[in-house]
Amino acid sequence: AGRQNLKEVLDGIQAAKEMGLPVKINSVNRKELNPISLVLYAQQQKIPLRFIEIMPVGYGKQYVGRSNDELRTCLEDEFGKSQMITYQANQKKQISHMVQTLHTKEVPIGSGPAVYYRFSELTIPVGFISAIHGKFCESCNRVRLTAQGYLKLCLCYDKGIDLRQILRGEETGQNEKNIQKALNEKLTTAMRAAIYKKPAAHCFEHPEEMTEINEMVKIGG
């Protein structure tokens, strides 16, 4: 978050591991980043590592990024050849309005935008989130909830919905159980309507079209 608190971060990672919590490390792929030491640390701690291409949001506008393909090539020079980690997924293919066939397809592991690779000299998986050079908007299944209760639909735009207004709505003449049920229904309806209008794609390649002005530390993850 722009502070020199490395010791606190490392202590926090260790504490989380000791508590048995699942831990992974996300690192922004900046041009001046030395990824080797970070990979060695993650390997030593047995923690999955993911590299995220820098996006022109907030402080990201001030830095020069590089593609994850370039970074992966750099890591191969140090840790051997890499291979995408996939699994066989069963998928249905429509032949006609009455006939379907079932076939298998190799797809990347995980349910998000990261594509994971196994390097021959590493035991940990290394993931790459390539928002710029591997645009994955058509399969994006992510929204963000800010600390202010605002549901963001895309990092590129300020579009979304303020869930606080719904939570603070007055429900009178009902018992607490019915009030909670009514609020849940309102939240579900509002979130579905907002997500249905999620932008088709980001516009990071055209920063002048961006409408989001907040820093990532305010947006959250």
Stretch-by-stretch model annotation:
Residues 44, 54-57, 61-221:
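Auxiliary Fe-S-binding modules of radical SAM enzymes
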